[in-house]
């Protein structure tokens, strides 16, 4: 598994320490183990998890600005845990409403000794935003309009929304509320992953 991850990282042009690689592989091992009982992801093959969960998450890292992020609807910690492993100086709040997912996140935090994540069981609308976050991240969480509507209280004035999408969601972009605009759209390259991947970065047009 470690060799596969190393090959994919080389192909993607991503440089990580051995410690970070080992942590990512250990996380996949835990996800595979817990998935059998908790049904945390539809991906059953650990080798496929490396591509569809690990690489697909960490390719976003170069685009994140700031230190404090919240991953809304994180599920089993995606993309928050892989990002926390590769960005040790940033902090990630991992938010999910399902208790079984948050229990898994806390176990990952304990076993991998990740000090830069905070798993939280809560609905996003009910979660307080003090202090504000630099970035709100989502992967397969909601439409862009729903994301900014439900999470508008979370980022600071200069905070951004980072939405991981497959094909470019042109209809969703066109439907954004007037007080939000797309700052940039980044086409992501994920080795061995079929289909397109995009990162949509949204800012609030606060006066």
UniProtKB/Swiss-Prot annotation:
Subcellular location, principal: cytoplasm
Catalytic activity: guanosine(527) in 16S rRNA + S-adenosyl-L-methionine = N(7)-methylguanosine(527) in 16S rRNA + S-adenosyl-L-homocysteine
Protein location: Cytoplasm
GO MF annotation, one: rRNA (guanine-N7-)-methyltransferase activity
Gene Ontology cellular component terms for the protein in this record: cytosol
Pfam families listed in its UniProt record: GidB
InterPro entries noted in UniProt: rRNA_ssu_MeTfrase_G (IPR003682), SAM-dependent_MTases_sf (IPR029063)
Family: Belongs to the methyltransferase superfamily. RNA methyltransferase RsmG family.
Role of this protein: Specifically methylates the N7 position of guanine in position 527 of 16S rRNA.
Protein name (Swiss-Prot/TrEMBL): Ribosomal RNA small subunit methyltransferase G
Organism: Salmonella arizonae (strain ATCC BAA-731 / CDC346-86 / RSK2980)
Gene name in the database record: rsmG
């Amino acid at each position: 598994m470690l060799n596969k991850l190393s090959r994919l990282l080389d192909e993607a042009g991503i440089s990580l320490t051995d410690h970070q690689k080992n942590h990512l592989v250990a996380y996949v091992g835990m996800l595979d183990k817990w998935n059998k009982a908790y049904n945390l992801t539809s991906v059953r093959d650990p080798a496929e998890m490396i591509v569809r969960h690990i690489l697909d998450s960490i390719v976003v890292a170069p685009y994140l600005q700031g230190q404090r992020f919240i991953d809304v609807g994180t599920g089993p910690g995606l993309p928050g845990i892989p990002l926390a492993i590769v960005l040790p100086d940033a902090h990630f709040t991992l938010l999910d409403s399902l208790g079984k997912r948050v229990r898994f996140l806390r176990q990952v935090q304990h076993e991998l000794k990740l000090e830069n994540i905070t798993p939280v069981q809560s609905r996003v609308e009910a979660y307080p935003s003090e202090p504000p976050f630099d970035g709100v991240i989502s992967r397969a969480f909601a439409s862009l309009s729903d994301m900014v509507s439900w999470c508008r209280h979370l980022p600071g004035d200069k905070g951004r929304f980072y939405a991981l999408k497959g094909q470019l969601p042109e209809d969703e972009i066109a439907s954004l509320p007037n007080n939000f605009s797309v700052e940039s759209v980044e086409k992501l390259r994920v080795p061995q992953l079929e289909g397109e991947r995009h990162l949509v970065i949204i800012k609030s047009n606060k006066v």
